[in-house]
Every structure is written in C-alpha cells, then in structure tokens.
Amino acid sequence: MTLKELLVGFGTQVRSIWMIGLHAFAKRETRMYPEEPIYLPPRYRGRIVLTRDPDGEERCVACNLCAVACPVGCISLQKAETKDGRWYPEFFRINFSRCIFCGLCEEACPTTAIQLTPDFEMGEYKRQDLVYEKEDLLISGPGKYPEYNFYRMAGMAIDGKDKGEAENEAKPIDVKSLLP
C-alpha cells in the first residue's frame, strides 16, 4: 500500500463521518406512527365495511355485482329473501389477504352498501383471521351517504304504493301511448 492510497482511504473515511454528522441533526422523515397521526388523503381506500340505511336495516341486496367487479375474486356472498320480497346476503365474506383495495366493489354497488373507509390497521398474525364475515363487516351507521335508502328510492319500501310513487321516482311510462 502506498502513501497515496492511505491518504485517499483516510479522506474517504473522514468524508463519510462528516456526512453522517450533517445528517444526524437534519429533520427526520420517519414518522412515529402511533404517537404522531398519519395524514390520509380524502379519497384513501382502506378497510371495506357494509353499511346500514337510515332505518337501521342492511343496505346490501345481494345483487352480486361487487363479487363480479372484484378483479381478484376475494368477495363471496349468498342471496336470501325475506317474507316481503327483499333480498339480503345470507352470508357475505371478504378475504382481505387477497384484496387489493382497488375500490371497484364500491363503485359497482347500486345501494352504496359496500364502502371503503380510511381505516388501515388490519394486521393479523394468521391468514385465516383476514377472512371477514358479514358480522365483522357490518357497521351501525350509514357511512358516507347518511340519507340514502335504496328501497325508498326504488319504490319498494312503502307498502300500499305503486311504482312511481316513491321519493325522486318518475311515473312509469305507458309504452303503448308512445306508438303512432
């Protein structure tokens, strides 16, 4: 080893120590999560929930559109029917170990029953615990759309009224009257 190589090596070490010393007092980029809350954008897509309508009933009508729209196939459900003809999911299951939180299920839902919330704390120790059933997904409130009630808008919630007499619903069109 020559003297020149020793001086170059020594200079490299001094430069490295100098840079470490400069960065030791710089502002830290790492956030200490539990103590310091993380900013989430307004449209952040996190945990999926099933909401209820303002009357307290489930919004989901088991139309299966969310399961069809899901690109990874992590949603499964089975339709059942009540005495008054309303559909509801007998079981509703989401496998969060497969979910990519794309939000296509929320867009496909005609009743706004399935919604993505900003909750992201879903860590589990076993994969089996990431399979959520309907009881785990249902929340007590209406979520993002507090006044929306699918059956009231569709004309099925009010007993004794015909189609076209619900809120914000146009009267049925008599197709024969349009003929020449």
UniProtKB/Swiss-Prot annotation:
Record keyword Metal-binding present: yes
Annotated keywords: 4Fe-4S, Cell inner membrane, Cell membrane, Iron, Iron-sulfur, Membrane, Metal-binding, NAD, Quinone, Repeat, Translocase, Ubiquinone
Cofactor note: Binds 2 [4Fe-4S] clusters per subunit.
Record flagged with keyword DNA-binding: no
GO biological process: aerobic respiration
Top EC group: translocase
Cofactors that this protein relies on: [4Fe-4S] cluster
Highest taxon listed in the record's lineage: Bacteria
Residues that coordinate or bind [4Fe-4S] cluster 1: C60, C63, C66, C109
HAMAP family per the UniProt record, alphabetical: NDH1_NuoI
Subunit structure: NDH-1 is composed of 13 different subunits. Subunits NuoA, H, J, K, L, M, N constitute the membrane sector of the complex.
Family under the similarity heading: Belongs to the complex I 23 kDa subunit family.
Name of the protein described by the UniProt record: NADH-quinone oxidoreductase subunit I
Protein's organism: Shigella sonnei (strain Ss046)
